[in-house]
Regions:
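Glycine-centered tight turns that cap/initiate beta-strands
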Residues: 68-70, 111, 188-191, 272
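Contiguous beta-strand/loop segments that form the cofactor/metal-binding neighborhood of enzyme cores
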Residues: 179, 190-191, 196-250, 254-452
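A contiguous active-site-proximal alpha/beta segment in oxidoreductase catalytic domains
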Residues: 137, 145-222
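N-terminal glycine-/serine-/threonine-rich beta1-alpha1-beta2 phosphate-ribose binding loop
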Residues: 1-137, 149-164
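Short basic (Lys/Arg) and small-residue
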Residues: 142
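Residue-level signal for the nucleotide or nucleotide-sugar donor/cofactor binding architecture
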Residues: 4, 149, 175, 393-394
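Active-site-proximal cap/loop segments of hydrolase catalytic domains
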Residues: 74, 85, 89-92, 148-151, ...
Length: 452
């Protein structure tokens, strides 16, 4: 593909302040690297978090273990993180990646095939759109967007530029979840009338943090990006950015997306709800936190079925011995899907009895499995090679649909009333106040373009 110089790209990206798209360079025909022996070069963006499979450390930790995949760059606004990340990539993959503070520099590198985004939520859309425009594939963490309108533009960009864009809803690649969904969609529990997701994860008190000088090596302006400018604050910069409205999608977006993605998939719902209610608040703590730590939402669909999502970030009881999982309620009984087991209980016309159970321990390995690698990353790389975005386990459209549910819940919470939504236009009906939350005021020049 044709390259563009940094000064040229930065100038073009500034044009986005007027709502114009960043001009994408021409994309080579026959981009596919179909041979498994051809190397796919990946850049990982956002490397502060190293745990699990969701943070940047988890991203490069997985990609480095896939044959003929090389992490050639790591990017973060905090340059203090580079030495450890470079050492870890070298240990895992055998090469020392270059380090980049400004994501836009990666867009000029014609040797990078894909970018993997593990940044705070408010950067996901713009990075994804920019990457698509210059012909790079994208793996983007959940929630895929900061606001609902961004998600639709991400889908449009992926399709317009024929990009492979995988959402980081890793359960889509779980054999256990796949088998549970097949059971449900085959009608073995009967007609499902309600699904429910719970996230009861205790979050400590973040307290109060005063503004302070910007640390050496931190590009605070780039961290804020599309968000309003504020003086540097360590709490807003660390993991606690999750709890401030400028950068947060609440725990709904942080973890609710995972649960409701499984609920929506199990119930085979590929449309938005039409009625949304949400209540909650910030309880039992005294701190700078702006978003709720208790939140419950109900979503009603055109055919009358209901979905619910509840978060509790304080000490609380469990449901069915679980503090994180999904439940399905149907004409023949109910089911629970957790991280390790899918359990069914039959109840129609008889005493509640345990039905079929599926355990992850009982599932035979598949040929594509690689020890120590989450299959979601393998699926992404396979589709990058084949150019078949249709084979993604979590295509960006599915990521948008599940993330949008959580945005709708947050909007109902912030407006404080029941909302009526047009699932096809993706607008609230006769409600300018609610519609104002579908997008945001962007700080220039970090505006998501009106046309991608």
């Amino acid at each position: 593909m044709k390259s563009i110089n940094r000064r040229g790209f930065l100038k073009k990206s500034a044009v986005a302040t007027a709502g114009l798209m960043v001009n994408a360079p021409a994309i080579k025909k026959g981009f596919a690297k179909n041979s498994p022996n051809e190397t796919i070069n990946v850049a990982v963006v956002g490397i502060r978090s190293r745990g699990g499979i969701y943070g940047g450390g988890g991203h490069y930790g997985n990609f480095c273990k896939i044959p003929n995949v090389r992490v050639t760059a790591v990017c973060d606004v905090d340059e203090r993180l580079f030495p450890k990340a470079v050492d870890e990539v070298e240990k895992l993959g055998g090469n020392r990646p270059k380090t980049v503070a400004d994501f836009r520099e990666l867009l000029e590198d014609k040797d990078i095939d894909a970018v993997s985004i593990a940044t705070p939520d408010h950067w996901h859309a713009l990075m994804t759109i920019w990457a698509c425009q210059v012909g790079k594939d994208v793996y983007v963490e959940k929630p895929v967007s900061y606001c609902l309108a961004e998600g639709r533009k991400m889908v449009q960009a992926a399709r317009k530029y024929n990009r492979v864009v995988q959402a980081g809803t890793q359960s889509r690649s779980s054999r256990l979840v796949q088998e549970a969904v097949k059971f449900l969609q085959d009608g073995k529990l009967g007609d499902i009338y309600m699904g429910r997701g719970i996230v009861y994860r205790y979050r400590g008190n973040i307290g109060y943090t005063k503004d302070s000088p910007i640390p050496k090596g931190v590009n605070w302006n780039l961290f804020l990006g599309p968000a309003p400018y504020r003086p540097f604050n360590e709490s807003r910069f660390s993991y606690n950015w999750h709890w401030y409205w400028d950068t947060s999608t609440t725990e709904f977006g942080n973890n609710g997306v995972h649960l409701m993605d499984k609920v929506r998939w199990g119930m085979n719902k590929r449309v938005h709800p039409v009625k949304i209610q949400c209540m909650g608040g910030f309880f039992a703590q005294d701190s700078d936190q702006e978003v709720p730590n208790i939140q419950t939402a109900a979503f009603k669909y055109e055919d009358g079925v209901i979905m619910e999502c509840e978060i509790r970030s304080l000490f609380t009881n469990s449901e069915h011995d679980s503090k994180e999982g999904v439940f399905f309620y149907a004409s023949e009984g109910w089911a629970y899907l957790g991280g390790r087991e899918f359990q069914t209980y039959l109840g129609k016309g008889r005493k509640e009895e345990p039905g079929p159970t599926i355990s992850y321990k009982d599932l035979a390995p598949v040929e594509s499995e690689i020890k120590g690698v989450d299959p979601h990353y393998i699926n992404f790389i396979d589709c990058v090679r084949s150019r078949r975005w249709q084979n993604l386990n979590a295509d960006i459209l599915e990521g948008h649909m599940s993330t949008a549910m959580m945005h709708l819940g947050n909007i109902a919470y912030r407006t404080g009333r029941t909302l009526t939504f047009n699932p096809y236009s993706e607008r609230f009906i006769d409600d300018d106040d609610a519609n104002s939350y579908l997008t945001r005021e962007y700080r220039q020049p970090y505006a998501v373009p009106n046309e991608v």
